[in-house]
Amino acid sequence: MSQSHGDRFALPCPLRKEEKKHRQKLLQSLPHFIYHPDPLATGAFVEGETKLCPSCGKESNIYYDLIPYCIEDIEYLCPMCIANGQAAKKFDAEFVQDAEWQGELDSEKNQLLFCQTPGYSSWQGEYWLSCCQDYCAYLGTVGTRELKDMGIAEQVLADYEAREEYQEVEDYLVKDGPICGYLFRCLHCQKYQIWVDAD
C-alpha cells in the first residue's frame, strides 16, 4: 500500500510562524461561525485569486471551497453571504447534509447550522453532532494518532463505539484517510466527540 499510496496519509507540515500569523489575520477578517470556529483550518474556506460571489456580487479572495446543497452548482460564495443567510435564501441552499438531535427541534439552531454555517468535506456528506441541546463545534479531521496526542483517544473512541456505528475503529482511523474521524466539541460541557466516515 505504501508504494501505491505514497505519502497520501502523511501529516501536513506544521505552519511556520509567518503562516500562522497570516491565517490568524484571515480568520479575524471572517464572520464568526459558532458551529465551525476555524473554517480556514478545516478547508471549508480557501484563500485564492479574487472571485465574484454569486450571492452578493462582491469580490472576495476568501470563498467557500465546497458546493452547497441546492439545485444549482454554486461556487465561490463569500463567507459573509453564508454567515448572514443571504446565500441560503437566494439559492434555497443548505450547507450541512444531516445532523443528530435529541428532543424537540430548535428552529433557530437548525437555521444557524444548516443555512448559516459552512459544512465540511467528508466521504459521505456532513453529519453534525449535538450535545447539551445544541449543535457542537466542528474542529476538523482526526485519526487515532491525533486523538492520542490530544489525550482524549480512550474517552472519544469508547463514546463512539457506544453509538454502534463502525466498530473497532481505533486501528484504522487515519486523519483524512479512507476511515476518517471528524472531531466535534460541545459548546457547553466542552466534551469531545467524533463521527467516523469511510470511503
Regions found by a protein language model. Give the residues of each.
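Serine residues within intrinsically disordered or low-complexity segments
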Residues: S2-S4
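Preference for intrinsically disordered or flexible, low-complexity segments
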Residues: R16-D199
